[in-house]
UniProtKB/Swiss-Prot annotation:
Subunit structure, interactors included: Binds to the N-terminal domain of the chaperone ClpA.
Entry's family note: Belongs to the ClpS family.
GO terms classed as biological process: protein catabolic process; proteolysis
Name of the featured protein: ATP-dependent Clp protease adapter protein ClpS
Gene: clpS
Organism expressing this protein natively: Myxococcus xanthus (strain DK1622)
Amino acid sequence: MAQKHEHDTSVITESAPKQKLKKPPLYKVLLHNDNYTTREFVVAVLKEVFHKSETDAVQIMLHVHYNGVGVAGVYTYDVAETKIQTVEAAAQENDMPLRLSMEPEEG
């Protein structure tokens, strides 16, 4: 709050004490394997929506294929939710049953 005295031309400002900002919690976006969604579609989604390189996208796709589930990326809640909705819409448009979920990142 600024205070000004009658014959004084200087202004004194008071600043609120700085609050430490907490980092928002992060969530893992998980891809789940199925027997119908093509490997090419999964790689394309990883590249286009999750901005993975070709190499990383293929590695993640293979991990999901052989292990049943894999992490596409780690994001804040809103970003994770948006990415899931984007992929689900693309999967539906392409008649793919690709399933995604998210869970809090531990640590």
